[in-house]
Regions:
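Glycine-rich phosphate/pyrophosphate-binding loops
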Residues: 173, 199-220
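A contiguous catalytic/ligand-binding core that recognizes phosphate-bearing ligands
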Residues: 63-197, 205-206, 250
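Glycine/small-residue-rich interface belts in oligomeric ring/scaffold proteins
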Residues: 38-69
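An N-terminal structural lobe/cap that precedes and organizes the functional/catalytic core
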Residues: 18-43
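A glycine-rich helix N-cap at a beta->alpha junction
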Residues: 234, 238-246
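Conserved small/polar residues in nucleotide/adenosyl-binding loops
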Residues: 247-254
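Short, Gly/Pro- and small/polar-rich lid/capping loops
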Residues: 1-23
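Short, conserved secondary-structure transition motifs
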Residues: 217-229
């Protein structure tokens, strides 16, 4: 994960200090990281990664759900006692004051990632993506997007990781993600892991090997409250990348 630490260092040392909507930040614009998934899974090793939260959210997206309480069911699958009191990374959005008048039910987060992936104006993008990769592997149209301008006002949070393209070469599946807004300390390690898992899932479903995850950052930033933690991060040496093992993965129902 040296390339992640390099991006973090660049932002911390070269970013502009500004007051943003969500707090003071150091921010920069435009950066690309590449992760060769054949060489290991790009999990950050210089701090803890919320692995179960990463996997649970991705599965929730793939279900096409807009129910934050459904995410809680997945996340706390082994401990559902007092589930109503347990939080997820989307709880704050579901309960936000600005969202209350738009929410249709308790836990509603609106037409966010999963809804767009599985029902973008009636289009199941995940199903189409897999079908396209199987039937027309050399196509330049293997696109997955959560950015639906017509429905941004119906989302509790507009998509940060907005647009991705999949690419096949030598039987290896790669993905490039464009992320418009990038929280370098908390969000980006989470996003790297999530899309790398997604590549594994889709590659497995299509019968391909994994290639690269390419992460293109738009507005990438470090919040002032994380400055001290970032400085600690930058003193640590990353460990050897872990490997991912699984017995069975499915990206969608084929029936």
């Amino acid at each position: 994960m040296k390339n992640y630490l390099s991006a973090l260092k660049y932002c911390y040392e070269n970013g502009d200090f500004v007051k943003s909507r969500a707090g003071n930040v150091k921010k920069a614009f435009g950066y690309q990281m590449r992760f060769d998934l054949e060489k290991g899974f790009p999990a950050v090793t210089t701090k803890k990664l919320a692995w179960k939260a990463v996997v649970s959210e991705l599965l929730w997206f793939l279900e096409g759900s807009n129910d934050e309480r459904r995410l809680a069911e997945i996340l706390y699958e082994d401990d559902r006692e007092n589930l109503e009191d347990k939080k997820t990374i989307w709880t704050q959005n579901a309960k936000a004051d600005y969202w209350k008048n738009k929410s249709n039910f308790k836990g509603d987060v609106g037409k966010i990632y999963g809804v767009q992936w599985r029902d973008f104006n009636g289009v199941d993008q995940i199903k189409n993506l897999i079908k396209g990769l199987k039937e027309s592997p050399d196509s330049r149209r293997h696109i997955l997007t959560a950015w639906n301008p017509a429905e941004l006002d119906e989302m509790s949070l507009p998509p940060c990781h907005a647009f991705s393209q999949f690419y096949l070469s030598n039987n290896k599946l790669s993905c490039q993600l464009y992320q418009r807004s990038c929280d370098m300390f908390l969000g980006v390690p989470f996003n790297i892991a999530s899309y790398s898992i997604l590549i594994h899932i889709i590659a497995k479903e299509c019968g391909y090997d994994v290639g690269e995850f390419i992460h293109s950052l738009g507005d990438f930033h470090i919040y002032e409250e994380h400055f001290e933690q970032v400085k600690i991060q930058l003193t640590r040496d990353p460990k050897k990348l872990p490997a991912v093992s699984y017995t069975h993965l499915r990206a969608h129902e084929t029936s």
